[in-house]
């Protein structure tokens, strides 16, 4: 829906990190077990470092550290602190010097940042993640040549083989070596695109189940009598290997004095950005805090916010004015919403959304822009957005004139509902990104949009790809190389806004079939090379609100269905009407090739073919498309 140090000893901080382990049965991946009725034990106390902390900053490798990092696995951090992972450590070495490894700070996000529900009691989407003790750790570095990345468990759990560690996307097929009982070494080749991947230790795996209660069921970690939904690490560990910027890219994405006047905030409390007179706000390495009752509403002169590697900014930015032709938000730093409550309402003193407000207009968004009738562009590059309290990115105004170039963007710790991915506006491109999201991830609402190389870790709410919610005119969309490494979409009833591909019914009344508009058209959308690792709930649900033509889904591979009944996993292709009863159309795929083309769609390695007898709702393909649309779709296996 619509500061860094070289050769310094880190603080000796002691804190226990809870690690919950369960047994899930022989049909699922091997997992560590806890004796029935026992309480999962906490990890060993984090204490003295194994070695002095050292970081790298040379032409081929750049890592960074926060001397104010603290182990706080269950409670909020102070304004001047950065939560350090109490579960993982990361070190990086150049491939030609594997024994000379440098530390890369490992961040950690916990549900609600440990705050609990402040000022509200209703559901916020973080219930299961909080109750199950989920966390998300991540570490970033810049590199220009091949590297070895060492990832160590701090939990006391051990492995005996590198094969007990899975890298996802699994297509990366990185070389792995066992260093010792808690450390694996991963060879990451250099790529101009970088890599964003999950490191998954077998003892950390758990399975989420649907308890089959009520209409939808609820997620639980209890196996007995329940249905498996997905297996994933309870404490995730993401590595973001980002390319060092050089030449024209560096000139475009890293500000200098030639770029304009620059304001350098001092680390610490930052609550005066509304009146900055410079054109550029440059956050150097360090920790910055806006507090829970402020976000930066920037003046018209500000065109660029830069977060340097090692900058950790607790806050959010609103570009209130629409006067700039070129905006930029760049840098490999972190922008964290951890201090805000869920749906922080600026009309309610930044407390949780009041009944008198509309969150769409008044709640804090991590990045918010206003667009004018004149052409505008945005470069969004490198930034890691952590723990959004609501939408992470919005643009309000003329959506046809705001064009975006998004590169190497990451989103982590999306525990709450409505923590969507990014909506790309007309003429925009996006590549080399990672999204942990708890709502629609890739929002395809506009024409002439191109997306490539996306890694998705999907939470419960919303689909992966969305182009519905209201009638639209969309033409020329290309989405390639999307990998869903995990998802917890679990509903046992048939929701309108879920699955991998989705065009939802109308947001005003999702049960209505009469809110379509035959005067609008969605056409020429191509989705190629979409891989879903592990189990998922459903493939495609299209509730067409517009005339629909030439939708091509090619090389769509699902690992397996979850443990729900086929009736919960069915795909739909439906045509809705307007209030006068006029039904939208879907192009004729057979024989005209102008409808919904599903080429090389497979489940568990078996290709689904319309002519092969494995496509229908109760069969492996789970395609329960309306009979009136028989000629509007085809599923087939193409020649190699």
From Swiss-Prot:
GO terms for molecular function: dextranase activity. It catalyses: Endohydrolysis of (1->6)-alpha-D-glucosidic linkages in dextran. Keywords: Glycosidase, Hydrolase, Secreted, Signal. Residues 1-32 form the signal peptide. Its EC number is 3.2.1.11. Its main location: secreted. InterPro entries: B_solenoid_dext, Dextranase_N-ter, Glyco_hydro_49_C, Glyco_hydro_49_N_dom, IPU_b_solenoid, Pectin_lyas_fold, Pectin_lyase_fold/virulence. GO terms for cellular component: extracellular region. It is found in: Secreted. It comes from the Bacteria. Belongs to the glycosyl hydrolase 49 family. This is Dextranase.
């Amino acid at each position: 829906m619509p500061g860094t140090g070289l050769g310094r000893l880190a603080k000796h901080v002691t804190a226990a990190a809870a690690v919950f382990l369960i047994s899930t049965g022989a049909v699922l991946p091997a997992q560590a077990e806890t004796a029935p009725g026992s309480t999962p034990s906490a990890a060993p106390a984090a204490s003295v470092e194994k070695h002095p902390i050292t970081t790298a900053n040379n032409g081929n490798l750049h890592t960074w550290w926060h001397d104010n990092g603290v182990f706080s696995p269950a409670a909020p951090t102070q304004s001047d602190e950065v939560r350090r992972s109490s579960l993982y450590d990361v070190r990086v070495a150049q491939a030609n010097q594997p024994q000379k490894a440098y530390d890369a700070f490992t961040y950690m996000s916990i549900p609600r940042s440990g705050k609990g529900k402040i000022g509200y009691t209703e559901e916020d989407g973080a219930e299961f993640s909080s109750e199950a003790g989920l966390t998300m750790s991540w570490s970033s570095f810049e590199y220009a040549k091949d590297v070895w990345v060492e990832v160590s468990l701090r939990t006391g759990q051990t492995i005996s083989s590198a094969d007990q560690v899975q890298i996802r996307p699994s297509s990366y097929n990185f070389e792995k070596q066992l260093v010792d009982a808690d450390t694996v070494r991963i060879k990451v080749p250099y790529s101009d695109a970088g890599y964003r991947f999950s490191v998954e230790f077998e003892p950390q795996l758990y399975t989420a189940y649907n308890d089959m209660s009520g209409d939808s069921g609820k997620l639980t970690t209890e196996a007995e009598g329940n249905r498996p939904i997905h297996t994933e690490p309870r404490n995730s560990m993401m590595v973001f290997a980002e390319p060092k910027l050089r030449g024209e890219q560096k000139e475009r994405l890293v500000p200098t004095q030639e770029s304009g006047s620059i304001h350098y905030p001092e680390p610490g409390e930052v609550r005066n950005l509304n009146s900055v007179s410079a054109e550029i706000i440059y956050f150097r390495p360090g920790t910055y805090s806006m507090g829970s009752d402020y976000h930066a509403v920037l003046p018209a002169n500000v065109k660029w916010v830069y977060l340097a590697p090692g900058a950790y900014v607790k806050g959010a930015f609103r570009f209130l004015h629409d006067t700039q032709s070129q905006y930029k938000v760049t840098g490999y730093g972190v922008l964290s919403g951890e201090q805000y409550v869920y749906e922080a309402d600026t009309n309610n003193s930044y407390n949780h959304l009041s009944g008198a407000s509309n969150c769409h207009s008044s709640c804090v968004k991590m990045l918010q822009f206003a667009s004018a009738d004149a052409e505008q562009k945005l470069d969004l590059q490198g930034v890691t957005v952590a723990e959004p309290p609501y939408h992470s990115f919005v643009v309000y105004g003329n959506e046809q004139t705001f064009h975006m170039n998004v590169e190497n963007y990451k989103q982590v710790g999306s525990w709450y509902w409505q923590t969507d991915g990014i909506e790309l506006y007309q003429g925009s491109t996006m590549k080399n990104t990672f999204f942990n999201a708890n709502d629609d991830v890739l929002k395809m609402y506009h024409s002439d949009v191109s997306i490539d190389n996306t890694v998705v870790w999907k939470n419960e709410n919303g689909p992966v790809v969305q182009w519905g919610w209201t009638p639209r005119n969309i033409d020329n969309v290309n989405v390639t190389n999307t990998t869903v490494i995990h998802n917890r979409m679990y509903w046992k009833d048939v929701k309108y806004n879920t699955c991998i591909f989705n065009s939802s019914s109308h947001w005003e009344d999702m049960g209505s079939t009469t809110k379509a508009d035959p005067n609008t058209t969605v056409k020429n959308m191509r989705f190629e090379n979409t891989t879903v690792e592990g189990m998922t709930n459903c493939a495609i649900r299209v509730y067409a609100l517009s005339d629909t033509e030439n939708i091509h889904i090619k090389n769509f591979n699902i690992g397996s269905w979850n443990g729900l009944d086929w009736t919960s996993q069915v795909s739909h292709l439906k045509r809705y009407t307007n209030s006068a009863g006029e039904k939208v159309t879907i192009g004729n795929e057979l024989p005209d090739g102008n409808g919904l083309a599903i080429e090389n769609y497979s489940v568990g390695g078996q290709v689904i073919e319309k002519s092969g007898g494995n496509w229908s709702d109760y069969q492996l393909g789970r395609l329960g498309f309306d009979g009136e649309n028989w000629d509007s779709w085809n599923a087939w296996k193409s020649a190699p």
